[in-house]
């Protein structure tokens, strides 16, 4: 007698399950198992089977979804965002186009200090509504799991406010969120002459954040003019002692040694890495620290030097991709666009890109055993794409290829409708 399950997806043109026993590094990122003419079975929010046509034999479903030859993949994972913030900074773009430097904009109260001011002034409810709007956009582009950082408070109450908003978001809408405490995002004006005291203030928040389960990771911006390698080492060691996973904004501009520090501390991820040295790349590979690359930021800032993804992959580094969604240097929720930029400017292949936005991204935020793969027992988080094959998504840029998004086996995005009028 056939076993009854909730849903079966049939007539899948190509299926990427992204099955892996761990994050993919180096040459293994090129190994992509593509299943043609595939099926997926779902019951009680979990994957029952995902494979070649015929795997559905012995099952009957309450609902049959005909994918009509479309591509199906796991839901995408965005492992680096600054989702919770007040205000916006579109005026700065015009100022930059007029030749005004970022330092001059900062001196006028703009830049990150503008976002800090707006985030401090916003109520928790205002931040919640704004972040929810942006998160719905992320979901519409196929992101079903994401990381979110604090870091626009730079003082106790606002940092905690940002983290509370992220926790409420996680509990109230479909996208799974992993929170990172990034009080060490910048040095506020009141601490410009004493950054060590500021770091002590941020470290003092760790027990409360841990007790209230507001964040899983701690992050710091290691860069010229922000925090030194020595300061970052002390901060991250204290965070590790408090039970937090470690992340680091490393070498975005200068090869300061952030990647080497990430490797030495065995951080879960090191992010940005535009200026990382050969030695830094080697240390990341040796430590198994995941490189989260943010090419959308380089693109938006109009810079020509991108992170050296090819050198990292050749050295055996595990590479991931993220939007870095934030109001100043990467105002986009569209991870599909990031996939295209990675192909064009990081010279990553389509196979490498798919690993970078699914399984590797999931491991970069501690969700490797839950997200980024379609296999029996995993949550049924998947995307049905209006695309004939996996290479089409990074190839055809600037549009949304999502047809439907499923989260825990339920359709949460449906773009089937025709344009009216």
Swiss-Prot record:
Q: Which reaction does it catalyse?
A: 4-imidazolone-5-propanoate + H2O = N-formimidoyl-L-glutamate
Q: Name one Pfam family in it.
A: Amidohydro_1
Keyword annotations: Cytoplasm, Histidine metabolism, Hydrolase, Iron, Metal-binding, Zinc
CDD domains assigned: Imidazolone-5PH
Its GO biological process annotations read:
L-histidine catabolic process; L-histidine catabolic process to glutamate and formamide; L-histidine catabolic process to glutamate and formate
Primary localisation category: cytoplasm
Which annotated residues bind 4-imidazolone-5-propanoate?
Answer: 89, 152, 185, 252, 329
* This protein's pathway: Amino-acid degradation; L-histidine degradation into L-glutamate; N-formimidoyl-L-glutamate from L-histidine: step 3/3
How many cofactors are bound and how?
Binds 1 zinc or iron ion per subunit.
Q: Which domain of life is it from?
A: Bacteria
Q: Which residues form a coiled coil?
A: none
The free-text function statement in the UniProt record for this protein reads:
Catalyzes the hydrolytic cleavage of the carbon-nitrogen bond in imidazolone-5-propanoate to yield N-formimidoyl-L-glutamate. It is the third step in the universal histidine degradation pathway.
Assigned protein family: Belongs to the metallo-dependent hydrolases superfamily. HutI family.
PANTHER family recorded: IMIDAZOLONEPROPIONASE (PTHR42752), IMIDAZOLONEPROPIONASE-RELATED (PTHR42752:SF1)
UniProt protein name: Imidazolonepropionase
Q: What is the lineage of its organism?
A: Bacteria, Bacillati, Bacillota, Bacilli, Bacillales
Tell me the name of the encoding gene: hutI
């Amino acid at each position: 007698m056939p076993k009854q399950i909730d849903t079966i997806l049939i007539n899948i043109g190509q299926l990427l399950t992204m099955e892996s026993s761990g994050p993919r590094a180096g040459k293994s990122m090129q190994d992509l198992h593509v299943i043609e003419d595939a099926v997926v079975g779902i019951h009680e929010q979990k994957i029952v089977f995902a494979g070649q046509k015929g795997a559905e034999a012995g099952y009957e479903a309450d609902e049959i979804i005909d994918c009509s030859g479309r591509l199906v993949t796991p839901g995408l994972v965005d492992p680096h965002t600054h989702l919770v913030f007040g205000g916006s900074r579109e005026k700065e773009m015009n100022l930059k186009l007029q030749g005004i430097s970022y330092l001059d904009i900062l001196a006028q109260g703009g830049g990150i200090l503008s976002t800090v001011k707006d985030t401090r002034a916003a109520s928790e409810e205002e931040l919640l509504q704004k972040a929810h709007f942006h998160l719905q956009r992320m979901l519409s582009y196929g992101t079903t799991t994401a990381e979110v950082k604090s870091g626009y408070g730079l003082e106790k109450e606002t940092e905690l406010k940002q983290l509370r908003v992220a926790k409420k978001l996680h509990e109230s809408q479909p996208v799974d969120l992993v929170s990172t405490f990034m009080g060490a995002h910048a040095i506020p004006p009141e601490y410009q002459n004493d950054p060590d005291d500021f770091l002590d203030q941020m470290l003092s928040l760790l027990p409360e954040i841990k007790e209230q389960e507001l964040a899983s990771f701690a992050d710091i911006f290691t860069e010229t003019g922000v925090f030194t390698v020595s300061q970052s080492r002390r901060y991250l060691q204290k965070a590790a002692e408090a039970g937090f996973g470690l992340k680091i904004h490393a070498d975005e501009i200068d090869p300061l040694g952030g990647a080497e520090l990430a490797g030495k501390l065995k951080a879960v991820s090191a992010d940005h890495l535009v200026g990382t040295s050969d030695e830094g790349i080697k240390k990341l590979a040796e430590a198994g620290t995941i490189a989260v690359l943010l090419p959308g930021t380089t693109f938006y800032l109009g810079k020509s030097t991108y992170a050296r993804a090819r050198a990292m992959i050749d050295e055996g580094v595990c590479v991931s991709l993220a939007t870095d969604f934030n109001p100043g240097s990467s105002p986009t929720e569209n991870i599909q666009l990031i996939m295209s930029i990675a192909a064009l400017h990081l010279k990553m292949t389509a196979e490498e890109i798919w690993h970078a936005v699914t399984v590797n991204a999931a491991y970069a935020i501690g969700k490797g055993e839950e997200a980024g793969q379609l296999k029996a027992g995993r949550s049924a988080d998947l995307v049905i794409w209006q695309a004939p094959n996996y290479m089409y998504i990074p190839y055809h840029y600037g549009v949304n290829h999502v047809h439907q998004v499923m989260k825990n086996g339920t359709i949460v995005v449906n773009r089937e409708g025709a344009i009216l009028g």
